[in-house]
Amino acid sequence: MSTQMAQPAAQARTGGAAPLLPGAWRSGLGRVGVELKVFFRDKQSVVFVFSLPAVLLVMLGSIFRGQAAAHGLSVGTLFAAGLIGGGIAATSFQYLGIGIATERDQGMLKRLYGTPMNRWAYFIGKTGLVVVCTVAETMLLVAVGMLIDNLRLPTSAERWWTFAWVFVLGTVCFSLLGIAISSIPRSARSAPAVIMLPFTVLQFISGVYVPATLVPPWLRDIASFFPLKWICQGLRSVFLPQRAVVLEPAGSWEHGRIALVLLAWIAAGLVLCLTTFRWRSSRDG
């Protein structure tokens, strides 16, 4: 009896993660369906997640249409590649961070913790939701970029491979960071401000809304510490012609460095998730 009582207490201290057993995958896949139903029933969330990056891309593409950046490249094309990276990060980091913080504050995580459901199933469900939304978001932004900014799809297997690993590493990286940062807001009301403010600033200095060459060097140095800058740089190497490499501060796409930075942040995000995730709000102790 004492051993059985000690197990929940130990799980509470470690975030409540039960072993990842085959049953967790079955429960997790079922949880993906639940998460998708809840997400698409919330029309405001659907509009916010999918429309905001697309609307920004249309606006920026229309404002800067026909304006040349350099070497025959349009400013709109630069924005399109950057906003695709920003969309990947926002869909995973911002949505997960705010969503999990809200569910914790409303007591939903506490109730899930008290059910027989394997703890990993919750994270599998969230991961499935992020993958579906991120793929859909990226397809939408690529389509808008092709219509508005003459963005072109990659024409070589090498570029498609680069797109694949940048997309996967970027999504995993920002999903883990979104789960980790969800523990910072103390209430659902404060979650959007706590999470969106630093992320918005990061977008401006990481080449999402402003070309990297126009960002002051000291701000570029700050941005280079975070993963968003490297995701955007990797996607520019996919969607822009090779001559656009001269617009990069380093004069190179730096694929090796992009991979190392993203892998380092994935490791850091995993550690943060394992050490900081809470099933209960601060009010519940």
How would you describe each model-predicted region?
Residues 2-52:
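Aromatic- and glycine-rich beta-strand/loop motifs that create alpha-glucan
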Residues 2-7, 26-30, 208-248, 255-256:
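Short hydrophobic, aromatic-rich alpha-helical segments embedded in or entering the lipid bilayer
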Residues 2-13, 239, 249, 256-285:
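Junction motif at the cytosolic side of a transmembrane helix
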Residues 15-18, 45, 77-81, 89-94, ...:
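Short alpha-helical transmembrane interface motifs in multi-pass membrane proteins
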Residues 39, 92-117, 127:
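Transmembrane helix boundary and interhelical loop/hinge segments in multi-pass membrane proteins
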Residues 41-66, 76-95, 136-137, 197-204, ...:
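Hydrophobic alpha-helical transmembrane segments of multi-pass membrane transport/permease proteins
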Residues 59-67, 182-229:
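Transmembrane helix segments
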Residues 119, 123-196, 200-202, 255-263, ...:
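Alpha-helical transmembrane segments and their short interhelical loops
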